[in-house]
Amino acid sequence: MPLNCIPSTVTVEAYEQKRASFADGMWVDVGTWGGVVPGNASSLVPMLAEGARGFKCFLCDSGVDEFPPVDEAQLRVAMTELKRVGGMLMFHAEMETGASVDGDQDPTEYATFLNSRPPAMEVKAIDLVVNLCREFGTVPCHIVHLSAADALPAIRAAKAEGLPLTVETCFHYLTISAEEVPTCSTEYKCCPPIRGQSNRDLLWEAVLDGTIDFVVSDHSPCTPDLKLHPCCGGKIAHGATEGDFVGAWGGIASVGIGLPLLWTEGKRRGLSLQDVARLVCEHTARHAGLGDRKGRIAVGLDADFVVWDPEEDNLIDAEKLHFRNKLTPYHERPCKGLVHQTVVRGSVVYDISQVDDSHSWENGFSKAPCGQWIDSPISRQ
């Protein structure tokens, strides 16, 4: 993503800096998205020429000063540029509706935060996206991390109209409901928020009927102090409240465990392994313009796959996860399915038989990273 880095990826120079920082340190192939912010429309086509897969924008405060939101007029300027070359624009689809936190509400209760970001924020934003998608016609538009099922009717109508609109949701929206979030447990905070069980069921219906095109992690970790989490033992910013959902960093950490999470919940709802492959591999590769290289096991494509046992018990242990800041809502969650090996372009880059007791994030990885930077031409096949 273009904003969880310094500098944000909103110019060609920032894109090149990010690419250089990844050199010789990747176990998987990596590409990046550029960002649309006020005033950078002239940088979009040059970033595409360098290899950016497309662009992301925010319709509300991103929480990052270097990545401000864009308004409707600024979107039109950006989409005019993207229309010249068929570039994709992805939307963090929330817009302000006037909802706020009442000063009398307890910020350590999840409901306080949830009520501050009602479904109407997503519905308002997605209505705008649909209108712009219709107006600009050939600009592929994508809704990232859909949370509110209230927006599904507008999405279904846009797709029935034949507009170039796609939509994703996330593992956490499909596997967690608001009713189960404990007090002070800020590891559950993300934006848009995890909503109630009935909303979750409607999202699943949209996954199963194809309204939602694919499922992703939206992995957004941070240090526990930024989460204002009780595990910090009071070591948080001066004046901050421990366990404050409103003030905590928003983001769910789940990279590497999405497959068992989706499979465990999806299997009982009628999801097949073929469906899982389509939702997390084939459609995501096509979305990133890599459908001619990745996303399927087929002659001529990159040999990227995992070797896993879909029936093996898997109790998620945060300390064994393969990322640095391990605060996650999935700690001690029982799942079905365990990855034994990960293969990238035919090379084994992870092998569970090589895992030891070190709890290092690279535990079990191959000694020599073989990942490549992806800047190949975009394919929509």
Q: What are the roles of these predicted feature ranges?
A:
Residues 3-6, 60, 94-95, 146, ...:
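Short, ordered loop/turn segments at secondary-structure junctions
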Residues 14-22, 105-118, 147-167, 222-252, ...:
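Short, electropositive alpha-helical surface patch
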Residues 110-138, 187, 214, 221-311:
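His/Asp/Glu-enriched, well-ordered alpha-helical/loop segment
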Residues 30, 55, 92, 141, ...:
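Divalent metal-coordination and catalytic microenvironments
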Residues 34-41:
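Active-site beta->alpha loop and helix N-cap motifs at the rims of alpha/beta catalytic domains
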Residues 42-57, 61-215, 231-235:
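Histidine/acidic residue-rich metal-binding segments in metalloenzymes
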Residues 232-244, 299-374:
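C-terminal cap of metal-dependent C-N hydrolases
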Residues 1-25:
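Metal-associated gating/positioning segment near the N- to mid-region
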